[in-house]
Amino acid sequence: MCGIVGAIAQRDVAEILLEGLRRLEYRGYDSAGLAVVDAEGHMTRLRRLGKVQMLAQAAEEHPLHGGTGIAHTRWATHGEPSEVNAHPHVSEHIVVVHNGIIENHEPLREELKARGYTFVSETDTEVIAHLVNWELKQGGTLREAVLRAIPQLRGAYGTVIMDSRHPDTLLAARSGSPLVIGLGMGENFIASDQLALLPVTRRFIFLEEGDIAEITRRSVNIFDKTGAEVKRQDIESNLQYDAGDKGIYRHYMQKEIYEQPNAIKNTLTGRISHGQVDLSELGPNADELLSKVEHIQILACGTSYNSGMVSRYWFESLAGIPCDVEIASEFRYRKSAVRRNSLMITLSQSGETADTLAGLRLSKELGYLGSLAICNVPGSSLVRESDLALMTNAGTEIGVASTKAFTTQLTVLLMLVAKLSRLKGLDASIEHDIVHGLQALPSRIEQMLSQDKRIEALAEDFSDKHHALFLGRGDQYPIALEGALKLKEISYIHAEAYAAGELKHGPLALIDADMPVIVVAPNNELLEKLKSNIEEVRARGGQLYVFAEQDAGFVSSDNMHIIEMPHVEEVIAPIFYTVPLQLLAYHVALIKGTDVDQPRNLAKSVTVE
C-alpha cells in the first residue's frame, strides 16, 4: 500500500524519484506526486491522478531541478482518489508524504483550523504538514519541531518531511509503517521499500518502531521518540537489481508463476544435508526452544493464512503437534487463552503486514514460548522482532496476487515440520519422505508448467461466468481456498471455497449449469469420499473441473472435465496442486481483460489496518 521515495543529493533527483515510484507501482495506488527543492529553496510540486507514467509525462513538460525531493504513490483511505488529495501535501514551506492512517486526524484538524490553518484536501496527511508547520513556528529546528509533533499523532505512519527553506535536510518518522534509508556516496535516500532504491544503492538502514531520522547528503542521524540518538545497523541488500524486469513474460504474475521451480530450489539451498533438514541458521539455541514446543499458533493474513492452514494438517499429522491458525486481524482484538509451551509462528511475504506485526507484539505480552517468523524480506520488521526467523528466499514478488511467496512459505513450513518431527523423536521415515518430496518438487512443478496451454484452453469456459466454487478435502481444502482467492483477486469473479464434505450443509443450493465447480483431487485416502461429493454436484447439473491423476478413475463427460495431473508425492501434493489453480486464475483474468498485476482496490503489502 502506498509508496514513498525521497532523495538528497548534489545532482537533480527527479528521475531518481520517478524511477523509485515505478518500482513501487506493484504495491497498488490511485495517484502519484513529487516535490523537488533546489539549492535556493525553490520548490516545485507535481501531482497526478492515475499512473506514475502520467506524472512522468508531466515532469517532462515541466522539468524539475533540485537535489532534494520526496515522492509518493497514494492508495486512498481518507478522501477519494483525486489530484487534490494526492501527496505531497504542503503547509507553506513544509512538504510531507505519508503512508498509514492518523486515527486522531479529526480533532487535530479542528485544533489547527482554530489556529488559522486552511485545509485544501480531505486527507489525514495534511494534518501532519500543518502540525509540523505550527510546531516549527514555536521555535527550534525542523528536527525539534518533528519531535514535538510526532507524539501528538495516533495511528500508523511512515512519513518524510522537508522544509523548502532548508533543502539540505530530510526528516523521517516511522510508527507502524516501514521506512528504509539508502546510503550513498555524498547522497542519501529513503523509501518505504528497498526495491525502490536498488538503482542507486545496496546499503540500507531499516528504521525501527518509533525512530525519527535526520538525513543530509553526508550523514544519517537516528533518534528515538525522546530525542535520544540511537544506532541502527546498516546491511547490504541481496535483492536483485533487475527484480522489476518482466523479461519475456507478459505480466509479473506470469513470471512469478514460472519462477517457482527455481524459487523453491533457492528455498531449499543449504537446508538439506545428508538426507536431513538443516535449519542451523536458526542459531545454536533454537533446538532447545523447539524441543519444548507443545502447541503451535500461526498468525497470518490473506494468502499467507492459507499456507498456514495447509501446515496445520502437516504439524498435527506428521509432527504430532497441535496447531491453530488464525487471521491476524481477529487474533489481535480478542481475548485468547495461551496454550502451554506454545510457539507463535507468523507468516508474511513482506514482513510488514500491520495486523500480523500487531499480533506478534501481542504474543510477547501474552507469554508465548517464543516466536518464529517465516518471511521473504530479510531485515523486515517481522524478522527483526521475532526470536527466530526463516527466509523463504523466493526473490522479489511484484504481482499483487501472491504465487511464489505462497509455495516457498509452504516449502519452509514443511521443512520445519521435518525438523520438529526429528526433535520429537518420531519415526525417521517422516523426515525422509518430506526431504524426498521437497527435492522432487521443483521438477514436478516444471512438469505442471509444461501443461500451461491446456489450462489456457480451459479458461475460456470461465469468461462469461460470475461465480465459481472450489472444493477440496484434507490438506487440499486450503488449496481450494487459495484457488478461489486467486480467481477473485485478479479476474473479479466471485469465488468461494468449501471443504467438500460441507456441500450438503449449504453450498449444494448454489449448483446449476452456470456454476463452475473446481475440484482438487489428488490420490490419497480421501479420494473416494471426494468422488461421492463430485457425484452430488454432477447429479445436479453442475459443471465440474477436476484436477486429478490419470489413474484416479474419473471419466470426462459433457459436464465433467478431467484435467490429468502427473503423479506427485503425497506430502508435497498441496504445493503442487496450487500451480494449476494459479495458471487458471491468470488465464481467466487475461480473457476478462483485468489488470493482472495491479487488480482494482488491492495493494501488495497491507501496512495499515
Curated annotation (Swiss-Prot):
One of its GO terms (cellular component) is cytosol. Keywords: Aminotransferase, Cytoplasm, Glutamine amidotransferase, Repeat, Transferase. It is found in: Cytoplasm. The active site is at C2, K604. It catalyses: D-fructose 6-phosphate + L-glutamine = D-glucosamine 6-phosphate + L-glutamate. Residues 286-426, 458-599 form the SIS domain. Its EC number is 2.6.1.16. It is an enzyme of class 2 (transferase). Coiled coil: none annotated. Residues 2-218 form the Glutamine amidotransferase type-2 domain. It comes from the Bacteria. The keyword Transferase applies. Its main location: cytoplasm. InterPro entries: GATase_2_dom (IPR017932), GFAT (IPR005855), GFAT_N (IPR047084), GlmS/AgaS_SIS (IPR035466), GlmS/FrlB_SIS (IPR035490), Ntn_hydrolases_N (IPR029055), SIS_dom (IPR001347), SIS_dom_sf (IPR046348). One of its GO terms (biological process) is UDP-N-acetylglucosamine metabolic process. Homodimer. HAMAP family: GlmS. Catalyzes the first step in hexosamine metabolism, converting fructose-6P into glucosamine-6P using glutamine as a nitrogen source. This is Glutamine--fructose-6-phosphate aminotransferase [isomerizing]. It comes from Escherichia coli O157:H7. The gene is glmS.
